[in-house]
């Protein structure tokens, strides 16, 4: 079993659940989505990642947070062990995506998230994206004020560079960074972000670790298939096990909209790959010539 990860001062299961797929186009019915969340929690997952804008469009904003809140209230297990991580700083004008990290928007977004989630304090609130109109120091400074007011417990940032992370840290304590990281997306590894996070004790939350639309490439990759057959696991589980072995700072949050996928992802924490297998994956990772949709 891979060691737990530390986030916001709490030890959590090394794999979280990305809840976005349960609120966008093609989403499951609410009852099924709640079953997915409960299945993940029942198999040890303790970090649920959401955001106010995980929705089909502008009129649907808040769908995912509302869903997560309902799932938690219906959960018969220990809700105190669950770390809910949400985000603010993005809007959905006309169904598109835009950045708004102005302090006044972040305050409104945080307060709306609290109401939708039905909790008194958000365990981890993340700046969803950097807004070119506002310095990251100003955005994070507002999150620090919200933390001091007791509305959130800890601050994270998302979709940032190493330089932006350092600027954010000058404004407040940053406990996590959430960036895209997976078999086909190695920038946090190649660009030094993962090393900085490991050195500074910051959790690197790997979103889209299974590639999103690139998941088909993972499923059909010859190396990942071969390693998976050897261990009796799927290529997707191979990738998650590789990420966990890559750095103790990395906490993948694979998305799921089906119960079986949520359970399989959580189970990857129990997989140990051999050193030669890890080396082979490392050598192959990032090679888009094998990508197929």
Where are these regions (language model features)?
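N-terminal binding-site loop/beta-alpha segment at the start of enzyme catalytic domains
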Residues: 1-81, 211
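N-terminal small/glycine-rich loop or linker at the start of catalytic domains
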Residues: 7-25, 85-97, 121, 126
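Acidic (Asp/Glu)-rich catalytic clusters
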Residues: 9-11, 42, 70-83, 114-118, ...
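A structural motif
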Residues: 12, 45, 119-122, 152, ...
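A short acidic, helix-capping loop that chelates divalent metal ions and anchors anionic groups
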Residues: 24, 54-58, 91-97, 215, ...
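Short, acidic/polar
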Residues: 28-40, 101-117, 161-166
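Active-site groove signature of glycoside hydrolases
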Residues: 114-132
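Beta/alpha (TIM)-barrel catalytic core signal, keyed to glycine-rich beta->alpha loops juxtaposed to Asp/Glu
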Residues: 130-293
């Amino acid at each position: 079993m891979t060691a737990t990860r530390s986030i916001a001062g709490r030890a959590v299961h090394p794999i979280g659940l990305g809840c976005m797929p349960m609120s966008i186009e093609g989403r499951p019915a609410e009852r099924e989505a709640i079953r997915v969340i409960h299945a993940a929690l029942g198999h040890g997952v303790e970090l649920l990642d959401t955001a106010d804008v995980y929705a089909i469009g502008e009129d649907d904003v808040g769908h995912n947070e509302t869903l997560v809140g309902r799932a938690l209230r219906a959960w018969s297990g220990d809700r105190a062990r669950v770390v809910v991580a949400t985000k603010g700083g993005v809007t959905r004008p006309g169904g598109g995506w835009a950045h708004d990290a102005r302090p006044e928007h972040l305050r409104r977004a945080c307060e709306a998230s609290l109401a939708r989630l039905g909790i008194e304090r958000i365990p981890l609130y993340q700046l969803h994206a950097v807004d070119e109109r506002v310095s990251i120091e100003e955005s994070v400074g507002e999150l620090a004020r919200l933390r001091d007011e007791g509305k959130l417990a800890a601050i994270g940032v998302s979709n940032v560079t190493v330089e932006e992370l350092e600027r954010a840290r000058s404004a407040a304590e940053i406990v996590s960074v959430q960036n895209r990281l997976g078999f086909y997306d190695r920038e946090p590894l190649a660009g030094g972000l993962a090393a900085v996070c490991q050195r500074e004790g910051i959790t690197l939350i790997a979103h889209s670790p299974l590639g999103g639309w690139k998941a088909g490439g993972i499923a059909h990759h010859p190396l990942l298939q071969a390693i998976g057959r050897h261990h009796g696991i799927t290529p997707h589980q191979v990738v998650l096990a590789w990420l966990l072995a890559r750095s103790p700072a990395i906490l993948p949050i694979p998305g799921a909209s089906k119960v079986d996928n949520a359970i399989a992802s959580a189970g990857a924490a129990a997989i140990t790959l051999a050193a030669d297998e890890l080396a082979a994956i490392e050598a192959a990772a990032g090679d888009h010539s094998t990508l197929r949709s």
